[in-house]
Amino acid sequence: MLPRRRVITPTYTTMSQFESQPLIGLTLEGLRKVAAECGMPPFSAKQMAQWLYVKRITEIDAMTDLSKRARAKLAEHGFTVGRQQPLTAAESSDGTVKYLFEGVGGRDIESVYIPDRDRATLCVSSQAGCRMNCSFCMTGRQGFHGSLTAAGIMNQILSVPGSESLTNLVFMGMGEPLDNLPPVLEAIEIITSKWGMAWSPKRITVSTIGKLRELRTLLDTTKVHIAISIHSPYPTERLALMPVEKAFPIKDVISLLRQYDFSHQRRLSFEYIMFKGLNDDRRHCLELAHMLKGLDCRVNLIR
C-alpha cells in the first residue's frame, strides 16, 4: 500500500504571539510564512532551508545569499536559528555517547550516539518524560514534563558532534513519539524532503507502543520503519508491564499492521525485553510466533 500524502500544518506562530522563534524545525511551508512576514520573496524559503538543514549554520548572518536587509528583518522579527549545543556528553567504553540537551518543563532530554562499524545511529527524544508509564522504563518513572517542538527534535539531530556523518535515526529516546505526532511528522518531513536533509525514509525508525489513530497516520503519511514495543504476547501480562495495553490492546495494533505491506522497503520489528522467569520461556516464544504469524516482521530480543 502506497502512503497517502498528508499536508502537515507547521507549528509556526507570528512574533506578535511570541517573543522569539527558532527557524530550525520549520518545514518549507513554515519558512514561506516567515519569508512573507519579513517581506522576503517566496524563494527565500528554500534558501533558508538549505542554510538550516544542509549547510547547518548556527547564525542568521551566515545566510549570505540573503540580503543584509532580509537578515536584519529576520532578527528584527525575533527569529533565531535556534541551535543549542549539548549541555553534557558522557562516553561509554563501547563508544556510545549520551548527550544531554535543554528540554522542556525544566527537564533535560537525552540523545544517544551509537557507532557500529559502518553505521552511526542517533537515538532521539520526542518528549521530556513520558505518559505511558511502562513499569520497566526509567523515563516513565520520571513523570511527564512536556513535549518537544520540531525545533527541539531537529536540534538534537543537527547539534550532536559529527552530525554530518550520521547514517541512521531512531525515535527511541525519551517519550512516546506518537504522543507527540505533529512535531515528529514535521521533523520527518524536514529530514526526508529534497529541500531539507534529503534522507531516505529507510534510514529512520520510529519506536512506539502503538497508539492506533496516530500509528495509522504515521503509516499513511511516511515510509519510515516501525518498531512496536510488545514485551509479552499475553494481554494480562503485558498490561502489568505496559498499562497502555488497556487503551491500545496489542491484538488491535497487530490487526492494524496487517493492513500494510512490510515485504518491500519498509521494515516492521517488534521490541521484546526478556525478563528472566517472567516472559522468556518456550511458552511465550510459541505464543508470540502464533500472534505474529503471517506478518513480514522481525523480533528484536533484548536482555
Name each region found by the language model.
Residues 4-6:
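Basic polycationic patches enriched in arginine
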Residues 115-152:
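Canonical Radical SAM [4Fe-4S] cluster-binding loop centered on the CxxxCxxC motif
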Residues 151, 155-163:
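Ferredoxin-type iron-sulfur electron-transfer modules in oxidoreductases and energy-metabolism complexes
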Residues 8-120:
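Flexible, acidic/Gly-rich N-terminal and inter-domain linker regions that tether
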Residues 113, 124-128, 138, 157, ...:
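Short, structured patches in soluble enzyme cores that scaffold and shape functional sites
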Residues 161-168, 173-303:
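Conserved AdoMet/S-adenosylmethionine-binding subsite of the radical SAM
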